[in-house]
Amino acid sequence: MMLGNMTFTQTILHELLRQHNMTKNEFIERFGLPPLVYVPELSPGAKTVTLVFYVIIFLAALLGNTLVVVVVWKNKVMRTTMNIFICSLAASDLLITIVCIPVTLMQNMLQNWIMGDFMCKLVPFIQTIAVASSILTLTGIAIERYYAIIHPLKVKYLLSKTRAGIILALVWVVSVGVATPMLFVHKAEEIHDFLYEQRFVTCQEKWWGQTQQTSYTIFNLVVLFIIPLLTMTSLYIRIAHRLWVQQPVGVTGNFAHGNSVRRKRQAVKMLVVVVLLFAVCWLPYHTVTVMNELTGLRLEEKSAKLLIAIVQLIAFSNSFNNPVVYAILNENFKKNFMTMLRCRVNRVSPQQVTPNTLQTPLEQSTRSCRLPAGAPNQQI
């Protein structure tokens, strides 16, 4: 705290109390001094709304993305190159769901950081990995679709399952590399308000200099958001031109060809929706982060806390969007999701087995839970 051109320290406080012959409380009341440390806190109403939405997002994202991984893992027919990429997306969303959402919720509920220095470093590290791997995986999917539709003769060589695995390994290595600075610039710090005798523990992001912090933020925005989105936009425009303009359904009279084009169109629609949702959900977060770095939010601290909580909530909501999109726009995923859910809910109990039943409850349950294979030509 500054008094004129003088920094207000504990030593100066004791000297002022001695000179004025006052207690600390009398001194505070006499001069109307505010706390030296102010940690903004959400209002009770905002906390309640935040809690409800975070719980909904957590449960929906955990269930949906787990179903995606299990469906692809258990069904050989579903293990296509693109579905391998989709599993990578689900893994990114599960990281955010399991690590980032609970800790961020706790941070919004409490004034003090109670998770220690390790979690203070881990959470932003994991969040950066997940966001970077998501956008790079989406770009990989767009490239895979581009070659599958525009250059179908090259796709089997250029993007086999093995090569897809190598590409995804590189995606995750790059994402870890991009996120590594988070381990060094975040730390849990105790702040002592010696005037009001309060102690707060906060998780702070402290760089070596403002230039490094701004450069890192701009790098993430441009290289890991704007450029990938522009790349995907260009690729999907070319794909759309090929499928909707150069290959109109019904012109050739070939029924099989028409069905193939329709399936490709449906897959492209689904992927474009996934990309749009990612962009819409993460754009507010990137915008607020860059504004804060370049100009400052210029808001009262409580309002800034609320704004950051809102954009975090919107960003995390993307974690459950993708499984919903797959269930609505892809028939294979929809059938497999329903089978998995029925498997959990409708298991046959011993009381349901009649004397005429030839199968044991276990056999009936196993048969009822078997995932539908789906025809190969229905894959996305």
Swiss-Prot record:
<feature type="glycosylation site" description="N-linked (GlcNAc...) asparagine">
    <location>
        <position position="5"/>
    </location>
</feature>
<feature type="topological domain" description="Cytoplasmic">
    <location>
        <begin position="73"/>
        <end position="83"/>
    </location>
</feature>
<keyword id="KW-0675">Receptor</keyword>
<feature type="glycosylation site" description="N-linked (GlcNAc...) asparagine">
    <location>
        <position position="21"/>
    </location>
</feature>
<keyword id="KW-0812">Transmembrane</keyword>
<keyword id="KW-0472">Membrane</keyword>
<keyword id="KW-0325">Glycoprotein</keyword>
<dbReference type="InterPro" id="IPR000276">
    <property type="entry name" value="GPCR_Rhodpsn"/>
</dbReference>
<dbReference type="GO" id="GO:0004930">
    <property type="term" value="F:G protein-coupled receptor activity"/>
</dbReference>
<feature type="transmembrane region" description="Helical; Name=5">
    <location>
        <begin position="217"/>
        <end position="237"/>
    </location>
</feature>
<feature type="disulfide bond">
    <location>
        <begin position="120"/>
        <end position="203"/>
    </location>
</feature>
<feature type="topological domain" description="Cytoplasmic">
    <location>
        <begin position="144"/>
        <end position="164"/>
    </location>
</feature>
<keyword id="KW-0807">Transducer</keyword>
<feature type="transmembrane region" description="Helical; Name=7">
    <location>
        <begin position="306"/>
        <end position="326"/>
    </location>
</feature>
<dbReference type="GO" id="GO:0007186">
    <property type="term" value="P:G protein-coupled receptor signaling pathway"/>
</dbReference>
<dbReference type="GO" id="GO:0032870">
    <property type="term" value="P:cellular response to hormone stimulus"/>
</dbReference>
<dbReference type="InterPro" id="IPR017452">
    <property type="entry name" value="GPCR_Rhodpsn_7TM"/>
</dbReference>
<dbReference type="GO" id="GO:0004983">
    <property type="term" value="F:neuropeptide Y receptor activity"/>
</dbReference>
<feature type="topological domain" description="Extracellular">
    <location>
        <begin position="186"/>
        <end position="216"/>
    </location>
</feature>
<comment type="similarity">
    <text>Belongs to the G-protein coupled receptor 1 family.</text>
</comment>
<feature type="topological domain" description="Extracellular">
    <location>
        <begin position="1"/>
        <end position="51"/>
    </location>
</feature>
<keyword id="KW-0297">G-protein coupled receptor</keyword>
<dbReference type="GO" id="GO:0005886">
    <property type="term" value="C:plasma membrane"/>
</dbReference>
<dbReference type="GO" id="GO:1901653">
    <property type="term" value="P:cellular response to peptide"/>
</dbReference>
<feature type="transmembrane region" description="Helical; Name=4">
    <location>
        <begin position="165"/>
        <end position="185"/>
    </location>
</feature>
<feature type="transmembrane region" description="Helical; Name=3">
    <location>
        <begin position="123"/>
        <end position="143"/>
    </location>
</feature>
<feature type="transmembrane region" description="Helical; Name=2">
    <location>
        <begin position="84"/>
        <end position="104"/>
    </location>
</feature>
<protein>
    <recommendedName>
        <fullName>QRFP-like peptide receptor</fullName>
    </recommendedName>
</protein>
<feature type="topological domain" description="Extracellular">
    <location>
        <begin position="105"/>
        <end position="122"/>
    </location>
</feature>
<feature type="transmembrane region" description="Helical; Name=6">
    <location>
        <begin position="270"/>
        <end position="290"/>
    </location>
</feature>
<feature type="transmembrane region" description="Helical; Name=1">
    <location>
        <begin position="52"/>
        <end position="72"/>
    </location>
</feature>
<dbReference type="Pfam" id="PF00001">
    <property type="entry name" value="7tm_1"/>
</dbReference>
<keyword id="KW-1003">Cell membrane</keyword>
<feature type="topological domain" description="Extracellular">
    <location>
        <begin position="291"/>
        <end position="305"/>
    </location>
</feature>
<feature type="topological domain" description="Cytoplasmic">
    <location>
        <begin position="238"/>
        <end position="269"/>
    </location>
</feature>
<dbReference type="InterPro" id="IPR000611">
    <property type="entry name" value="NPY_rcpt"/>
</dbReference>
<keyword id="KW-1133">Transmembrane helix</keyword>
<comment type="function">
    <text>Receptor for QRFP-like peptide. The activity of this receptor is mediated by G proteins which activate a phosphatidyl-inositol-calcium second messenger system.</text>
</comment>
<feature type="topological domain" description="Cytoplasmic">
    <location>
        <begin position="327"/>
        <end position="380"/>
    </location>
</feature>
<keyword id="KW-1015">Disulfide bond</keyword>
